[in-house]
C-alpha cells in the first residue's frame, strides 16, 4: 500500500482549484514542466540540484538539455547563469515562499517556471508559468495544473491520459481501512 504523498480517494465535487483560459490540465508535474518548456520555446532547463530525479529524466527523455544550480540552506538559489534559450525552474519548497518573496526571487530572470508541486495553495505569479501537483494534497491519483500565459497552447497535441492504470493504490487504501474495521 502506498501512502507517502497519496491521500485517500476523494470523490466529493469540490470544483476546480484553477480555472480559465490560462490553465492547462495534464497528468504529471514533470509533464507540466515540459509543457512550460514547449510554451517558452527553449531547449535547455536549469533545475536546482535538490529536485526530483524523475523531472530530470522526463525532460532528458523529451530531448531537452538539463543543467543545474545550487541552493543554500534556506532553499535560495546560488550563482545562476542563464542563457537566452534556457528556462529556469524555481521550486517553492514545502510552500515556504510567500508571493512577495517569489516575486523578488524571479526578478531579472526570463523563461521562469515555478514548481509548486509542494505548494498547491500558493497564488500563481502573473507573467510566468506556475506548475502544481494536486495529488500531494488531495485524494486524486495524478494530475497537474499549469497556470500562465496561453497555457492551453499545445495541449490538444497530447494523448488523453487515463488514471485507471495508476489509481489502484487509492482503492487499496479504502480496502485496507474497511478490512481493519471488520476484523
Named regions from a protein language model:
Residues 2:
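PLP-dependent enzyme catalytic core of the Aspartate aminotransferase-like
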Residues 5-19, 23, 31-107, 116-120:
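PLP-dependent aminotransferase-like
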Amino acid at each position: 500500500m502506498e501512502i507517502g504523498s497519496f491521500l485517500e480517494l476523494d470523490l466529493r465535487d469540490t470544483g476546480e482549484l484553477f480555472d480559465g483560459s490560462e490553465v492547462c490540465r495534464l497528468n504529471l508535474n514533470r509533464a507540466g514542466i515540459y509543457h512550460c518548456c514547449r510554451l517558452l520555446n527553449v531547449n535547455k532547463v536549469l533545475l536546482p540540484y535538490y529536485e526530483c530525479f524523475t523531472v530530470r529524466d522526463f525532460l532528458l527523455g523529451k530531448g531537452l538539455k538539463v543543467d543545474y544550480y545550487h541552493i543554500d540552506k534556506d532553499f535560495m538559489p546560488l550563482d545562476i547563469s542563464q542563457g537566452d534559450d534556457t528556462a529556469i525552474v524555481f521550486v517553492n519548497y514545502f510552500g515556504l515562499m510567500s508571493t512577495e518573496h517569489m516575486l523578488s526571487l524571479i526578478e531579472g530572470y526570463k523563461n521562469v517556471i515555478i514548481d509548486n508541486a509542494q505548494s498547491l495553495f500558493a497564488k500563481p505569479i502573473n507573467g510566468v508559468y506556475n506548475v502544481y501537483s494536486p495529488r500531494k494534497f488531495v485524494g486524486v491519483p495524478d494530475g497537474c495544473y499549469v497556470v500562465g500565459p496561453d497555457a492551453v497552447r499545445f495541449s490538444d497535441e497530447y494523448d488523453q491520459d487515463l488514471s485507471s492504470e495508476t489509481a489502484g493504490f487509492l482503492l487499496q487504501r479504502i480496502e485496507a481501512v474497511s478490512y481493519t474495521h471488520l476484523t
